[in-house]
Amino acid sequence: CHSAYAPEGVNAISYAARLISRLDALGESVAQQQDSRFSPPSGTLQVGTIHGGAALNIVPQSCWFDFEIRYLPGTRPQAVTDALGDYAREQLLPAMRKVAQRSDIHFQTLSHYPGLLSDPQSEFARWLAQWCGSDDFTTVAYGTEGGLFDEAGVATLICGPGSMAQGHKADEYISIPQTERCMAMLENLCAWMRADPSDSLR
């Protein structure tokens, strides 16, 4: 409806803002679960995009936003999504439907993969250290599909050149020395795959 009659419509952006505010509060609870092996030492929650409305003088009838939860291994992101869904269903929808009965709020999972915490003392880790020439294992804050393989029972470690310090920005790059180390590791891996399966770990 026209903004001159704003009380007669449900402002989708306003209700989306309330959901986002609730997410911020839930993010504080996520930050309380910490693991010093990671940096940052807690999971994170953030809204990355938001879209809504057609014109300044029209009450927006739709709004949608994307948010992500990056969670530590052993924690449950469902606790956040369940709490947000309860808030939408119990607090927001009743107020919205008092004005417009057909109002609704929908949630959709776009992607999901679990966190990963590999054992640096595993046999596979020892092989990888030999191929790389380094046993400097650490944790990272970004997500990979590694957690899916780990859940399926596949020994999983994340290894590769580059740093997120140079990622997701203009002129992102991987240095030549890092690329050369990666090639050496891949050559060692290929040599191992061609070797006799009975060969023991050296």
Task: Indicate where each model-derived feature is located.
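Metal-dependent amide/peptide-bond hydrolase catalytic core
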Residues: 1-202
